[in-house]
């Protein structure tokens, strides 16, 4: 079974690595496409600026002889008609980073808890349409942009070639989108002095009382003005009108219980369980007892084959094995009383010898005594000849 589990782990790791490589490849492809798209929008803006500068110079130099650029001709520099933008620039479809998304909604919460919604009245605080008040028609949370319902925000856009029909015009008007950082909320508040309601620009909003409803997977929260403790109500959303169709399932059929689970029968026929569980999958970890017993028996047979080589021994190896078995059967030798007493005597004698001075051999003592006796009697000629000085005799 260990081999099966190891195989499952290896297969899972292999699939995880393959998925990781695939995701990395898809991420690189997506980033390459997005960078190309952003580069095209940036290049288009630069080309339009250059074309505007050239057109201004030509109009100033040529005067009445200046060309009429408002005719239905595509400008070769940017591929758009005169006075129109591409849909990418008009709708701000260029991908932005996470830091840019957070910066655009810094005044109204965060990308996760956004404090504005379609239906809010906002005012434009920057750009050509500054001080314009309108209602949010659409909200794009991917790029954090809003589409304001106002005729002044309509922009001429060149329709792509693949979207044009014979009867359609090559230029159409669409609502230009603005980043959320370019707008602020407008809400009527009561004036404490006059008691009248008037529109007030809300420059900062924060979420409060965030509640997550798990059964419906919805989230509700309130928004307020920090420092003023003023709760700003959410705009009323119109209910979605759904029309019944002939193919719709009736409510009575939805509420009817057609299956009651029980423990007396399996959830599916026995014949299709193997198909549902994918019996031969390499990721399978649950097996039947018969299959487990079969695999364990195969492992035991493999181990028996490995141990069969140990049975082929030479006569010397067999003799050594028998001797080891006999020694193992005898066990550890037991000490008798005499052996213990002898060990005690040896230990005591060794301890006594460590405390006394080292003994001198008897032959050495006899030689020293003889030399001292000769020196005390005056010594002989042989001893005098060997003496180097009267104060330091040499003993051989």
Curated annotation (Swiss-Prot):
Stretches the record annotates as Disordered: 374-396
Subcellular compartments: Mitochondrion
Gene Ontology terms: biological process: translation
SMART domains named in the record: KOW (SM00739)
GO cellular component, one term: ribosome
GO MF term set: structural constituent of ribosome
Biased segments, Polar residues type: 384-396
Alphabetic keyword roster: Mitochondrion
Physiological role: Component of the mitochondrial ribosome (mitoribosome), a dedicated translation machinery responsible for the synthesis of mitochondrial genome-encoded proteins, including at least some of the essential transmembrane subunits of the mitochondrial respiratory chain. The mitoribosomes are attached to the mitochondrial inner membrane and translation products are cotranslationally integrated into the membrane.
Protein family: Belongs to the universal ribosomal protein uL24 family.
PANTHER family to which the protein is assigned, alphabetical: MITOCHONDRIAL RIBOSOMAL PROTEIN L24 (PTHR12903)
Oligomer and partners: Component of the mitochondrial large ribosomal subunit (mt-LSU). Mature N.crassa 74S mitochondrial ribosomes consist of a small (37S) and a large (54S) subunit. The 37S small subunit contains a 16S ribosomal RNA (16S mt-rRNA) and 32 different proteins. The 54S large subunit contains a 23S rRNA (23S mt-rRNA) and 42 different proteins. uL24m forms the wall of the exit tunnel.
Protein name as it appears in the record: Large ribosomal subunit protein uL24m
Organism, as annotated: Neurospora crassa (strain ATCC 24698 / 74-OR23-1A / CBS 708.71 / DSM 1257 / FGSC 987)
Taxonomic lineage: Eukaryota, Fungi, Dikarya, Ascomycota, Pezizomycotina
Gene: mrpl40
């Amino acid at each position: 079974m260990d081999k099966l589990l190891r195989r499952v782990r290896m297969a899972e790791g292999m699939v995880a690595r393959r998925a990781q490589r695939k995701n990395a490849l898809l991420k690189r492809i997506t980033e390459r496409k997005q960078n190309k798209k952003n580069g095209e929008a940036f290049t288009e803006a630069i080309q339009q600026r250059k074309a505007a500068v050239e057109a201004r110079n030509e109009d100033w130099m040529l005067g009445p002889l200046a060309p009429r650029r408002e005719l239905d001709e595509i400008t070769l520099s940017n591929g758009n008609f005169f006075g129109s933008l591409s849909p990418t620039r008009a709708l701000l479809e260029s991908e932005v980073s996470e830091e840019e998304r957070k910066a655009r909604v810094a005044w109204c919460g965060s990308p996760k808890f956004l404090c504005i919604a379609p239906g809010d009245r906002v005012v434009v605080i920057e750009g050509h349409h500054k001080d314009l008040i309108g209602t949010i028609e659409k909200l794009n949370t991917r790029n954090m942009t809003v589409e304001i319902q106002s005729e002044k925000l309509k922009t001429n856009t060149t329709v792509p070639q693949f979207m044009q029909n014979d009867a359609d015009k090559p230029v159409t008007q669409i609502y230009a989108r603005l980043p959320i950082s370019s707008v602020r909320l407008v809400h009527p508040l009561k004036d404490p002095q006059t008691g009248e309601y008037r529109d007030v620009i809300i420059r900062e909003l924060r979420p409060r009382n965030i509640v997550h409803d798990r059964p419906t997977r919805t989230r509700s929260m309130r928004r307020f003005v920090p420092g003023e403790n003023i709760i700003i109500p959410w705009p009323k959303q119109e209910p979605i009108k759904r029309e019944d169709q002939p193919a719709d399932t009736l409510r009575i059929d939805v509420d009817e219980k057609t299956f009651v689970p029980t423990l007396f029968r399996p959830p599916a026929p026995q014949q299709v369980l193997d198909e549902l569980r994918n019996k031969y999958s390499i990721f399978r970890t649950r097996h039947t007892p018969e299959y487990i017993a079969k695999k364990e028996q195969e492992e035991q047979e493999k181990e028996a084959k490995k141990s069969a080589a140990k049975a082929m021994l030479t006569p010397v190896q067999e003799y050594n094995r028998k001797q080891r078995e006999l020694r193992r059967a005898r066990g550890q030798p037991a000490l008798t009383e005499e052996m213990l007493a002898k060990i005690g005597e040896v230990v005591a004698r060794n301890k006594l010898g460590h405390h006394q001075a080292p003994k001198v051999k008897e032959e050495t003592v006899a030689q020293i005594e003889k030399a001292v006796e000769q020196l005390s009697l005056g010594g002989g000629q042989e001893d005098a000849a060997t003496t180097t000085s009267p104060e330091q005799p040499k003993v051989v």
